[in-house]
């Protein structure tokens, strides 16, 4: 029960003891039992549904801060209708202990599995050397390629990450050398109906062909494919690679070819098109430092930036001391949640201190970089590419946002990264910085966001490209799929890529796993205590 404020139109005077009209409660794991008992106080349990979004969060490790809470929620749960929603929910047969436990608690349980997949977008998987990867250019033996095709047929969500151009090239090769069985030739398979030839259908057709290629032909097919592969973003360099003769730019371009295109603030920036990029790594600080180092900012310019940052930091230190003095003068009334202007300060001393704080903040220097250093600005592209790439994504760091960041008590490294259009979600105590990065991510104004693998859950920011760091080689297959799901979430087909810094992660993605840590952990946690 609540009342509407006549002036503002807002909701006020809410009486939470009356819950008969409450139809939905959104809560986190720690609040679940409270929310459950509240809803049970006003509703028949058989008419309530618990919708558990992303139940595999935290299930990819043996120990996690949420495990105890999750176990208690499951053990004490009284609601017989439950939806577990996840793109990587383990198969039913892997969750039998959990299912049997649920059946033992509630009568007449009906189990329903709903599966869907979307492969109407093409998101290219790029390996550490810069090549576009599909099953047909990964596996040397026919047994391996056949097993992979069978696995992908069972898990069609993986088709989303098969590059359509590579698939079509492969099919054309098979057709040219008459390696397609008669009944699987395109005209027969698609029944001469051009309306059936869609992206989804082509990718399923591709899986069928992989399983029906003559086994004796596979060695020569694989050899041809490997020898004719080209890097997705290959740019020829017309100079001899000699460190004594080449400029920094030419050296960087040479390094780019050898490294698979990882110089994202210089030679490879133009390959990040249409929208922001997310870089997943557990070594967030290391990657951030790498991109500052590789940004080709001259020492004189960099020293000037550091000089201004040092001056700003000295001013911020004085501001912090004055704010502490002001808080004491006001009897610790001022807080982070209550901002006070000079007009509200009654003490003459408090007014004086407040004016000093304002004067000091006005002295904080705003910083910006010359466009020549900002990824994909025209001036930047004039250095790094022979022709302007119109689709190349450009960060947008306005002066007001830059000034807000400069005023924060924050590592200088993070401030410089933001000037480059790079935000960082690392563990640090400055909430204001995190909120600025979130705001800019939502507005698609950042070039790259560097974050840990746990960031993949619960974000709907739209990314066009993703880098998965080599330090994530032990990431589970299910979590890798979750990570890939951050790319291509809008409604149109653009140039999407997922770039892996370790090829083993790609192999793990496309091979049947002997164990499933998410399933094992769920079966361990989602079992009721004996006394329940």
Question: For each predicted feature, which ranges?
Answer:
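SF2 helicase catalytic motif II
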Residues: 22, 27-33, 40-83
